[in-house]
C-alpha cells in the first residue's frame, strides 16, 4: 500500500475556511480528479460534508470517511473510526488522503508522496496544510518551474510534487 496526500493551499498554507475551500479553481479540481480517479480516497467527516451533494460520493473512487461518531452512516461511503482502520480496510491499493487538517497530520508520517496546488491568493482561514520539512521531503516537480499559471478564474496557481526522502 502507498499513502499519498493531496491538497490545495494558499501561499501561506491555508487549506480551509469555515468548513470550505476559500477559492474556486477548476484546474485544481481537474488535477485532483486525474490523480485520484480509480483509487480510494480517505477524508474526515467535515471534509465529506464540505463536498457538494452532487459529488458525494466522489465518482470513480472508493470513499472512506473517518468519524468518531459511533454508528454514523453516510450514503455512498464507508465510515471507519480511524486512519488505521481505513488503511486496513483498503488493503494494498494506492490510497489518497484528501483532508482535512487533522487527517493530514495523522497521515503525513505514513505518506510517501504529496501533491500540492499552491494558490497565489491571500485568504483568511482556520485550517492549514502540514509543513513539508526539507530534510524529510524532496520536491520532484513544479509546474510551472518558475512563476504561476493563471486560472480561468484569474487566480494564480502552480502544482508541486513531493516524495519522501
Regions found by a protein language model. Name each.
Residues 1-165:
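Enzymes that bind and transform nitrogen-containing heteroaromatic metabolites
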